[in-house]
Design a protein with these regions (language model features):
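Noncatalytic luminal/extracellular "stalk/propeptide" segments of secretory-pathway proteins
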Residues: 2-13, 17-115
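Alpha-helical metal-binding/catalytic segments enriched in His/Glu/Asp
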Residues: 45-46, 120-121, 208
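A conserved hydrophobic secondary-structure block that centers on an alpha-helix together
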Residues: 102-145, 149
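Solvent-exposed loop/turn segments at secondary-structure junctions
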Residues: 29-30, 58-60, 103, 121-124, ...
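Hydrophobic/aromatic beta-strand patches that form the interior of the parallel beta-sheet core
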Residues: 53, 137-139, 172
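Alpha-helical scaffold elements within enzyme catalytic domains, especially in hydrolases
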Residues: 21, 43-44, 129-132, 185
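Soluble metallo-hydrolase cores and metallopeptidase-like ectodomains found primarily
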Residues: 76-108, 158-208
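BRCT (BRCA1 C-terminal) domain core and associated BRCT-interaction motifs
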Residues: 62-64, 69, 139, 145-154, ...
Length: 208
């Protein structure tokens, strides 16, 4: 049976107090603040009477840091994604090619050495298809706002069998509004796109 004092402590105010405390930390994987949040929760559970153990284990983490995007020399706000490769500081540069939602096949060689501009939310399948079609980078046009997402299909830390599901070319996303401007520019001219990504991807210790 539940301890009567524990039942008394169950309340919306008590819950929101804990949520507010936890949300005050930026809990990036492998960060000191993530560890502090874990210790805070462990202490709460210990005080209730649970036996808990905080362990540190190796994990392959990926945190998007920054991206820049220039289309025809005009800077456009963009965001990169977890598991996107980082570029060199000066970025990559190539002609852009709009391929719609990229569900249909395109003529072989059409994307060779180009940066693909694709409709929809960033995902591994479209990135991998662009890569195998010869693209060196991908710009996704989001349906609305840019969603935080991971562009890998290797769930959890990759193994020798799943590492092939991690993208090999850099990826950024733009808003739908910016995407319409990019499409208009590409339809009128042959345009150079420059994109740079910085993503902190590495093995590190994280709590659990």
């Amino acid at each position: 049976m539940l301890n009567n004092n524990l039942i008394i402590d169950i309340s919306i105010d008590n819950l929101m107090e804990k949520v507010k405390k936890i949300s005050g930390w930026q809990r990036y994987s492998g960060s000191d603040e993530e560890l502090e949040a874990f210790k805070y929760l462990k202490n709460i559970l210990d005080n209730i009477g649970y036996e808990t153990k905080l362990i540190m284990h190796d994990a392959y983490i990926s945190i998007p840091i920054s991206s820049t995007l220039y289309v025809g020399g005009v800077q456009i706000y963009s965001q990169t994604h977890s598991m996107s490769p980082s570029t060199i500081s000066s970025g990559i540069e190539a002609y852009g090619l709009y391929v719609g939602d990229f569900k249909n096949d395109i003529e072989e060689g059409t994307l060779n050495g180009k940066i693909a501009v694709i409709e929809g939310r960033a995902g591994f399948e479209q990135v991998d298809k662009a890569y195998t079609s010869g693209a060196i980078g991908v710009v996704f046009i989001s349906d609305g706002v840019i969603r935080e997402s991971i562009v890998s299909n290797a769930w959890g830390s990759p193994t020798q069998y799943t590492k092939k599901f991690i993208p090999k070319i850099p990826v950024v996303s733009v808003t739908n509004e910016s995407g319409e401007k990019i499409k208009d520019t590409l339809q009128k001219n042959i345009v150079i796109i420059n994109m740079a990504t910085t993503v902190d991807t590495r093995w590190t210790k994280i709590p659990s």
